[in-house]
Regions:
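Short Gly/Pro-enriched turn/cap motifs at secondary-structure boundaries
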Residues: 54-58, 312-313
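Transmembrane beta-barrel domains of outer membrane proteins
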Residues: 66-70, 104-106, 189-191, 203, ...
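Transmembrane beta-strand segments that form the barrel wall of outer-membrane beta-barrel proteins
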Residues: 82-86, 334-343, 385
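Alpha-helical support elements that line or immediately flank enzyme active sites
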Residues: 62, 186-192, 206-208
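Surface-exposed loop/interface segments of Gram-negative outer-membrane beta-barrel transport/assembly proteins
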Residues: 1-47, 83, 87-185, 201-318, ...
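Predominantly transmembrane beta-strands of Gram-negative outer membrane beta-barrel pores used
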Residues: 1, 17-18, 54, 62-88, ...
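One face of beta-strands
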Residues: 117, 356-360
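Short glycine/threonine-rich loop-to-helix capping motif typified by GTGT followed
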Residues: 348-352
């Protein structure tokens, strides 16, 4: 047999009778015995497919209602949706409920004035076992579990072998996460056709994200084959409350003028400004050592074992931009651009940068001699020069000098 060593170099781990039980995939259990590194544990022979015992098939349901209509000067669309998704674990809970609202409308307020609205809202509520995301990786724990380890002892309690947590018990009894999120985006746009060829466009986009997460991590008791409690794991128990909110704003205003003169001269001029900003805040409160685990509200935890921390940041980019484009006879093109960007990532005295650009093009393919040759359907020669800024890799507050705190010195610099 492949599992049998007969040259005397090792002490046999299994007898011939035990190897036969393995071959038969027997569910027979032998009492505690000396069997190598697992001395003191019962001896098992039946192979267990832990992946199959723990992981099932997810389920997803989708419901949608759509309404649309309009008239001569307006149009609208409304979409409502609900999605319920059940995760793949067979133990514990993993249910995610999501709700959607999508709305679009366009209204011609006056003959030359149009307002467009695009709204999107999504809310979700997910309840799932904290064993999926908190503490030890549950998939690593499944991998470490011996394939012949039973899930339950004869008393029907989750069985623990070799000191490793039972993955099913972690999912079922290890605690819960309740995560609620809300995400809304409102996009407003106003277009005014002032005169022939000239329009003003204003756009305001607001995005708001909120998250409220309640996390409990519970102690679990390990039981041996005789249903004796042998140890407590995942201690101390704990509860956390996490809040997060993000508010993003993007405002743009620009004028765009396009005019053709005598069918040979095309002029396009655009000038505008924009503002983009984001505010982020996050707060977490935690308590540990709860006397009971039925209700793990924060106020019921130990006041001596509590932590609270927060973080937040804010950034802004303001810009001015302009572009002038002139085309003659649809063959000769020259264009100039310039923009100024001010970023909050830089010191106030060095916050702004100016970035010009120019390019020229010759559509050789439109020349009569090139058309007669018939070599190319389209051929363009182009040359350009431009400057651009880059703030990637620069932290939000890198320009601010750090302050060192000490118990013995004034907290300024390194002195």
């Amino acid at each position: 047999m492949a599992l049998e060593i007969t040259d005397g170099s090792f002490t046999p781990e299994y007898t011939r009778d035990q190897l036969e039980l393995i071959r038969q995939n027997s569910d027979q259990v032998l009492p505690d015995a000396e069997w190598g590194r697992w001395t003191g544990y019962p001896q098992f022979f039946k192979d267990q497919d832990w992946n199959d015992m723990l992981i099932g098939n997810g389920n997803m349901q989708n419901y949608n209602v759509n309404i649309s209509g309009g008239g001569e000067r307006y149009s609208y669309m409304l979409s409502l949706g609900h999605q319920r998704e059940e995760g793949i674990p067979k133990f514990g809970e993993d249910v995610n409920k999501r709700y959607f609202i999508r709305a679009k409308s366009s209204v011609e307020i006056f003959k030359n004035l149009t307002y467009d609205l695009n709204l999107a809202y999504e809310a979700s509520n997910r309840d799932y076992s904290s064993g999926l995301t908190e503490g030890q990786n549950i998939w690593e724990l499944i991998y470490k579990t011996r394939s012949w380890t039973p899930m339950y002892n004869p008393s029907g309690t989750f069985y623990t072998f070799e000191g490793f947590d039972n993955p099913a018990q972690v999912l079922e009894d290890g605690g819960m996460v309740n995560k609620t999120t809300g995400n809304i985006t409102v996009n407003n746009q106003l277009r005014w056709k002032v005169i022939d060829g000239l329009q003003l466009v204003g756009q305001a986009v607001i995005r708001k994200y909120d998250m409220d997460e309640n996390v409990t991590n519970k102690k679990i008791t390990n039981y041996d084959w005789d249903n004796n409690a042998v140890r407590e794991k995942r201690t101390p128990n704990s509860a956390e409350r996490r809040y997060q909110k993000t508010l993003s704003k993007n405002f743009t205003l620009y004028a765009d003028y396009k005019k053709n003169f005598n069918d040979r001269h095309d002029l396009s001029v655009m000038v505008g400004t924009s503002h983009e900003s984001e505010n982020y805040d996050r707060f977490t409160a935690k308590r540990i050592n709860f006397d009971q685990q039925e209700n793990m509200s924060l106020q019921l935890g130990s006041a001596q074992d509590q932590n609270a921390w927060s973080e937040g940041n804010q950034w802004t980019i303001n810009s001015f931009f302009s572009r002038v484009n002139y085309t003659f006879a649809n063959k000769y093109v020259i264009e100039g651009t310039i923009r100024a960007d001010g970023s909050s990532r830089f010191d106030p005295d060095h916050r702004w940068g100016w970035f010009p650009g120019v390019n020229a093009a010759w559509r050789v393919g439109e020349e009569g001699f090139m058309k007669r040759l018939g070599w190319f359907e389209d051929l363009k020669v182009r040359a350009s020069y431009g400057e651009m800024g880059n703030q990637s890799g620069i932290g939000l507050y890198d320009y601010i000098q750090l302050i060192s705190l000490s118990n013995d010195y004034y907290p300024f610099g390194a002195g």
